[in-house]
Amino acid sequence: MTENKKLQIKEFFLLDKSEKEFWLTKIGESDWRAGKYLFKILSEGSFNQQYGEKSKVFLLTQGNNLISFCSFSERDEIPDTELTPWIGFVYTFPAFRGKRRIGKLIEYIYRLAKNQGFKQLYISTDQKGLYDNFGFSFLQTMTERWGGETLVYQMEIVHKDYSDIIGKTVRGTIDRPLGASHPRHKEMIYPINYGYVDGLFAGDGAEQDVYVFGTNQPLKTYEGKIIGVYHRLNDVEDKWIVALDDRPYSDQEILEAISFQEQYFMGELYR
């Protein structure tokens, strides 16, 4: 079943010929005018000429399904601007909307931009307020190449320091033990213990949330060491990663374990 297959991010220009042909056909099936245009310039081989030699196109896939796509480019539809880089051609197929899947591509591009030393990411849109949900804020109205007005949003690329937190021992309460269901979304089952630090309040005004590693049994309370912080890019709260043991958990292991909930948010793990 498709739902049981993992989401994957693919870089279009790194695919082999047959894969490119397959996914290009999927892009062409979008019901969006700009998606059709992307299909055209990818088919013609003129994408990089228009948007920059280092520009890329990313696909979010699940099995043989194309969930979302977007570009990460040096230039966008606005001429004579020094703003760079841009996220563009942002699209999610109708059958997969409602779960903020495009956020996974934006999160991935955010990390790329951060690793390349950029301080901001930009996006041009006619959708007022849409990208506020993905960590962007309105910058200004600009004129695009065809003469119309477009709304430009920017996302600050942040570098957090959690050195004063990571390594500390904390204790608290488990209010959603392993095997429990989410109080509002009953289909979400907690594969690990989830709780909070007693008496310590986070940015959302509630007690600081924690994911607790190191046991396969449901808990009521815990005491362990903070081994990481998951910083949400489009929310006001961080999630602390707490271990009950001294096992060296990998980043991938942590991210996979918390993805049942964090897949609906954008974020990055600090160790």
What are the residue ranges of the model-derived segments?
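Hydrophobic N-terminal alpha-helices or hydrophobic patches in metabolic proteins across all domains
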Residues: 159-271
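Conserved beta-strand in the GNAT
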Residues: 57-59, 65-75, 86, 91
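Short loop/turn motifs at secondary-structure junctions and domain boundaries
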Residues: 48-53
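Short amphipathic alpha-helix that is part of the acyltransferase structural core
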Residues: 2-46, 57
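Conserved acetyl-CoA-binding loop-helix of GNAT-fold acetyltransferases
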Residues: 92, 98-111
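Conserved active-site alpha-helix within GNAT-family acetyltransferase domains
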Residues: 119, 125-149
